[in-house]
C-alpha cells in the first residue's frame, strides 16, 4: 500500500489537491510503520509467504481514493482479523494483538479516504456549507470563509494549497 499511496499522492498533487496528496503521503508513512512492526516479528532465515496483492492501476484522484478506501476496508475487516486468528491458533499472541491494533488504524484510513472521496465527488474539497477557517499549506495564512480563495492573498499560491485549518496543539 505504501508505494501505491505515494503514486496516488503524485496524481492528487498534479490534479490540484495538495491536502489529499499530503494525506496519501502521511498514510504511506503509517503503512511503512505497520510493515516495520510486522517485519520485526520475523526472526531471520527464509520465510515462505503466499499471498495475493492488489496490483490495481494509478488513475484519477477520485478513483485512487475509492481504491484506497476499498483496500483499507479489506485489511481491517478481513485480512487482519483472519491473520490475528491464525496467529492466536499458532501460539503467537503478540502478533495477534499487533494485527488487531493495526486493523483499528486501517479502519481510520478507510474513513478518511471515504470522507475525502465524498468531497471530491461533491466538488466540496475547497468549499463548505458554512464558514470555516481555511489555512494555506504553504505560508500559513488563515481566513474564515465558506470557500477557499482562488489564490492565497499572502503568498499567491493557488487554491490547491488551502485546507480546513486543524489545531492539534
Q: Can you name each region flagged by the protein language model?
A:
Residues 1-169:
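Non-heme di-metal
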